[in-house]
UniProtKB/Swiss-Prot annotation:
Keywords: Mitochondrion, Ribonucleoprotein, Ribosomal protein. This is Small ribosomal subunit protein uS12m. Disulfide bonds: none annotated. NCBIfam families: rpsL_bact. Protein S12 is involved in the translation initiation step. PROSITE patterns: RIBOSOMAL_S12. It holds the Pfam family Ribosom_S12_S23. It is found in: Mitochondrion. Component of the mitochondrial ribosome small subunit. GO terms for cellular component: mitochondrion; ribosome; small ribosomal subunit. The gene is RPS12. It comes from the Eukaryota.
Length: 125
């Protein structure tokens, strides 16, 4: 416990906040190229095969990004747009791919939550 005089002389050191999305360089999104597309199993108690892509961003950072939605057309060398946002049950996956931008297609035939998955507006009858 510092004395009052020590606090006047030195002050308190502020805690540094860690940046969870350091690879984005303070940008809202970044583009990147897929190095590998694979699946990964989540932590307990969940069970699935979550689709992820290893992406090299335009600033040369290599990251893992989650591919949301059902089905995708990503391959090696596809370009994608990346945003922040972790996947709670996949350790080390702190980014999401944005659907409907660059080489990652939106989900055809999706009617709800279309903006999150880059889906076209359905034709009204």
């Amino acid at each position: 416990m510092p004395t009052f005089n020590q606090l006047i002389r030195h002050g308190r050191e502020e805690k540094r906040r860690t940046d969870r999305t350091r690879a984005l360089d303070k940008c809202p999104q970044k583009t990147g190229v897929c190095l590998r597309v694979s699946t990964r199993t989540p932590k307990k108690p969940n069970s699935a095969l979550r689709k992820i892509a290893k992406v090299r961003l335009s600033n040369r950072h290599d990251i893992f990004a989650y591919i949301p939605g059902e089905g995708h057309n990503l391959q090696e060398h596809s370009t994608v747009l990346i945003r922040g946002g972790r996947v709670k049950d996949l350790p080390g996956v702190k980014f999401h791919c944005i659907r409907g931008v660059k080489d990652l297609m939106g989900i055809p035939g999706r009617r709800r939550g279309r903006s999150k998955y880059g889906a076209e507006k359905p034709k009204s009858i």
